[in-house]
């Protein structure tokens, strides 16, 4: 009985992990780059999407104004031409690199916060008070007791 339960639980966990992995992967990344952020993030709102396949038509899921939104991608014109060209992989945006194929907005937001933390305008760290040697709150030095 115990081995049956073990194998059943193992099989269930394997299938659940595979199913969740496919759901998180989502579809293909859509053509183009997310538009550049204009302004700073003041208050986050609800996200409209989690991946490009959540957005209708050719819109992309981009992190703008503190949340993910479905927006039309920036399209860069070929030099001397009239057609749009997908340059999202070949030429990075100023100050950053394009998102690699298959990456999700969640990894993009994590890298955004890792690079820009603390957010601009928050202020500086508080100075350490003079004479403060230790920040061990609630721990006072006590004499060593000898155990006999």
Curated annotation (Swiss-Prot):
Cysteine pairings via disulfide bonds: 34-62, 41-66, 49-61, 55-70
Keyword Signal: yes
SMART domains, A to Z: WAP
Keywords: Antibiotic, Antimicrobial, Disulfide bond, Protease inhibitor, Secreted, Serine protease inhibitor, Signal
Keyword field contains DNA damage: no
Molecular function as annotated in GO: serine-type endopeptidase inhibitor activity
The WAP domain, residue ranges: 27-74
Gene3D superfamilies the UniProt entry points to: Elafin-like (4.10.75.10)
Primary subcellular site in the record, as a coarse category: secreted
GO cellular component: extracellular region
InterPro entries in the record: Elafin-like_sf, WAP_dom
Biological processes per GO annotation: defense response to bacterium
PROSITE patterns from the UniProt entry: WAP (PS51390)
Cited function: Antibacterial protein. Putative acid-stable proteinase inhibitor.
Name of the protein in question: WAP four-disulfide core domain protein 12
Organism whose genome encodes this protein: Lemur catta (Ring-tailed lemur)
Name of the gene: WFDC12
């Amino acid at each position: 009985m115990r081995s049956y339960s073990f194998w059943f639980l193992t099989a269930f966990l394997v299938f659940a992990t595979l199913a969740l992995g496919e759901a998180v992967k989502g579809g293909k990344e859509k053509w183009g780059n997310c538009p550049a952020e204009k302004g700073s993030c003041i208050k986050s709102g609800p996200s409209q999407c989690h991946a490009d396949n959540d957005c209708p038509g050719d819109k992309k899921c981009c992190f703008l104004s503190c949340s993910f939104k479905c927006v039309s991608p920036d399209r860069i014109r070929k030099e001397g031409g009239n057609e749009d060209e997908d340059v999202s992989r070949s030429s990075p945006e100023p100050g950053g690199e394009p998102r690699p194929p298959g990456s999700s907005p969640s990894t993009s937001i994590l890298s955004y916060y890792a690079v820009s933390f603390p957010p601009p305008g928050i202020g500086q760290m508080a100075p350490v008070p003079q004479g403060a040697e230790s920040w061990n709150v609630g721990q006072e030095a006590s004499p060593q007791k000898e155990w006999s």
